Amino acid sequence: MGITISNHKKSIDMGYGGFLNLRATISTLVPCQEFVDIYRELNDGYYTEWKKRGFKTREEYFEDYDNRVEEICVRNKLDEEVVNFLYRSDCVTKSLSPKACRHLWWLIKDYDDNVLYGYCGRPDCAKFKDFKEIVRTCAKDRRVMRFS
């Protein structure tokens, strides 16, 4: 069970961990170190960060976290489409609009790595370049990117 990311020409498969890593990589491309740091905190916060920061419950921590993210995004005029992509639930997200794909493309177009985000051992294991190709095609052809 995992996620298939597709458009009208191509699809890639990855597990939830691969999708988490993909979005974590994309978050490092956002031109605001404060955002990069708080996004990284998300993974830590889910398990222990709330205790370290003196919150009594995870709910209190995440309410504070959401407020800090919103304040950082507004103050730094971060791209709402990209931020929404990074924070969307991977369980309920079904598509990304062509507009959001264009915004995402401008952020990721000059980046590449050799990390395997898909299922290792498969001949078609998804890499960042495969994700970029899907995003670029959606942006160029004005098509929706789908998640299933």
Regions found by a protein language model. Name each.
Residues 1-148:
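Acidic (Asp/Glu-rich) sequence patches and key acidic residues
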